[in-house]
Each structure stands twice: as C-alpha cells, then as structure tokens.
Amino acid sequence: MHHELTSLLKKLLCSHKDVSRLPALLRTSCLFGQGEKADTLYFIEEGLIKLTRTNDLGGRVILAVYGPNELVGEESLSAGKHFYFAEAEVLSPATVYKIPGATLESVKSAHPELGVALVRGLVDSNLGFAQKLEWLSLHDVESRVLYYLEQLAKLVEPAEDQGYPLPLTQLELADLVGATRETTSTTLNSLEKRGFVKLSRRLLTVYLRQGKAAAAGGENWP
C-alpha cells in the first residue's frame, strides 16, 4: 500500500474516537462474513488476514492474503448498500483498527487528500488481482506456488535461520494458487527436497536465499 495512505490512516483515523483497535485477534477469528453488509473498513496493524470466496457448490478460493499496513473491507467505500464479497479471517495473531463507514466519510470530507490516497490504494489492489489472474491463467502449479510463497514472505519477518514462517496449511495454499490439495502437496514435497521450503503442521517456512541461488543456477524461481 502507498506510504502516503498508510501515514494518513495512522494520522487521521487510528486515533479517532469512533475507531476501535482490536488487539490480539486469534487465528480463525472472523472480521466479516461473505454477504454481510459492508459498513466497516479494517486497517491491519499486525498479523495476516485472508479473504476467502465460497461459491454455491462449496468451492473455495483465497482471493488474497493481507499483512501489516494494508486494508480489508474496501466494499465499504462504495456508495449505497453493498455487501462483503468474501470472508475475512485471521491467519496469524492480529491487531486491526475497525473504521466505521460513517466515520471514514466524515474524515474524508474534512481531509480530501485521504480520498485521493484511497483511490490510489484501490488502483494498486486492482493491479494485484490482475496479476493474480495472470499467474493463475498462464503459469504451471509449481511456478504459482513459488510466486505466492515469495509474495507472502514479504509480509512476515524472517526467523533466526533466515526462513520466512508462513502460518498456512497446504489446503490454504492450494486455495490460494488455484490447485488441488494433492497437487499442491506433491509440489511442496518436491520444493522441500530442494531446500526451498520446510513443511510443518499449519506452517510453511520459505527460504528465499536458497530459492534465489537456485534461480541463478537455472532452476525455477519467479
């Protein structure tokens, strides 16, 4: 997200009397459900939040995973009555700011620069979804897995062994990259043998240094 938008949100909204800070949200906590009235915007201070869309047949896709200084619930910015397109669920212990739509509108009216920054942020978000569509449509499963692991690693701090711990199950990664759990599991096992990842229960550790070194040697890495 644009640094300008992050700064404005912290300056104008995070300390606002009508904005609530929700600390220490646990994994699987739900910020909002798919189809619920969209009347609140959320700003992530720490932790990871996933957006999941479910169709009428029970099929799922994780649209995105967001981290610190990012927004979820942008549907609340639309004029009129709108609903959340996907469910927002906590992936790792998180702290978020809950911004009522009416409060946001009031602050935007007093500070037009916030509205401009929000538009720029939405453009970035749209480009991100377009890029995801490109990867889903034009790349094989291993390439998609590697791409998303690298993107997600940017949202967390490295551990002492320089690995980036991602609190994802293999099924969640499959829902993110648009593949079956079985295919994703086979791909991850192959990547683990090559030293790119380490698999644990509800945790994938990504080793970017090994991946970049492998890419320099001609192996697949985005």
Show where each model-derived region lies.
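Residues that scaffold the ATP/ADP-binding catalytic core of kinase and kinase-like folds
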Residues: 52, 74-75, 106-107, 148, ...
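Cyclic nucleotide-binding regulatory domains
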Residues: 24, 29-92
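Short, well-ordered alpha-helical scaffold segment located
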Residues: 70-71, 103, 172, 211
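Cyclic nucleotide-binding regulatory module and flanking cytosolic helices
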Residues: 1-30, 71-72, 76-79, 110
